[in-house]
């Protein structure tokens, strides 16, 4: 599973003693705790609950607008960061970064897009994307090169104003 794989990887890299992994219902396993760094790669691909052979049902499934898990994560983030703490998350460009920025601003946090890259979107995954999102974002944050499709993926840093960047 992801927790075991993550622990093994960090031990191999020499960081196993300073990292914690938690498994559970979003913020529930860490209620009342604050962290200097939170790293998350949430499923937030805009799609319904489609079955894709060889993939778990939760594979990338972020609900019709991609925000099913992203929004509750962002809403609870401020309660789990130390005053100078920050979160580093992946954020698909076709799932409004501006909406995320507005959400965390209500909690007194700031967002900075630290890096943008293109990520290959396999055809079976693209076929699962919510039609409306695909119509709006095709040619904007989803780019096609011949038979291949790529989506803009941001690495986003979130923290108190003055601590990000």
Predicted feature locations:
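Conserved Class I S-adenosyl-L-methionine
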Residues: 116-165
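Conserved Class I SAM-dependent methyltransferase catalytic core
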Residues: 67-126
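Conserved Rossmann-like nucleotide-cofactor binding loop
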Residues: 1
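S-adenosyl-L-methionine
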Residues: 4-32, 36-40
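Short, hinge-like loop/turn segments at secondary-structure boundaries
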Residues: 12, 38-40, 56, 106, ...
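Short amphipathic alpha-helical segments
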Residues: 7-8, 50-53, 100-102
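Mobile active-site "lid"/loop adjacent to the S-adenosyl-L-methionine
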Residues: 40-72
